[in-house]
Regions:
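A short beta-strand element within beta-rich, extracytoplasmic domains
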Residues: 50-58, 112-118
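Surface-exposed ligand/attachment interfaces on beta-rich extracellular proteins
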Residues: 27-47, 59-69, 76
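Glycine-rich, low-complexity segments
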Residues: 6-34, 43-44, 142-157
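Extracellular jelly-roll beta-sandwich "head" domains, especially the C-terminal globular C1q domain
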Residues: 90-166
Length: 166
């Protein structure tokens, strides 16, 4: 097998690697308001985990089953980094108002801090813990492999690799 073939096979293996998700936490009462809390999630500190997926619903009383997804890369933060911690916002939008809640993962990855929920009105943000209610949290393996540049590299190389076998 030539060096070129080996490179092509390695690139294909990298591109085809699918993310794996493992449930770390589930809200026992997603139809109730969700107050701020720090969840202990030792599963985030496991070697190989490179991200976290948070599923939320717009409102604790929603019955339509719609979930909103927030993926947070843990190796290279793409959100704000404040006081050594990565902070991300997720939100769902109603007819007039927007809703949001902060998710903060310290660098030790042993907890996830969840803020109050907020309802944005035309005049100000109003605390509303029945909005953006977390439903489940998953660890992600291979979801952000090699960080942002790994994903960019994969996207750039896909046409080339496909051409290897044409």
């Amino acid at each position: 097998m030539s060096l070129f073939d080996k490179i092509c096979r390695a690139l294909i293996k990298m591109i085809r690697k699918k993310p794996e998700y493992k449930k770390l936490w589930q809200n026992a009462s997603p139809t109730s308001t969700f107050n701020p809390q720090a969840l202990s999630l030792d599963g985030l500190a496991v070697k190989g985990v490179d991200g976290v997926r948070i599923l939320t619903k717009r409102n604790s009383s929603d019955t339509d089953g719609a979930l909103y997804i927030t993926d947070i890369p843990l190796n290279e933060f793409s959100g704000k980094e404040i006081a050594g911690e990565a902070m991300f916002i997720t939100g769902a939008y109603g007819k007039i108002y927007g809703y949001y809640r902060y998710f903060n993962i310290p660098k030790d990855r042993k907890t996830i801090n969840i803020s109050h929920g907020y309802d944005t009105s035309p005049s100000a943000d109003v605390q509303a813990n029945n909005h953006v209610v977390p439903v489940a949290i998953y660890s992600i393996v291979n979801g952000f492999k090699n960080g942002l540049w790994g994903g960019v590299l994969r996207n750039l190389l896909q046409p080339f690799v496909r051409g290897c076998f044409v």
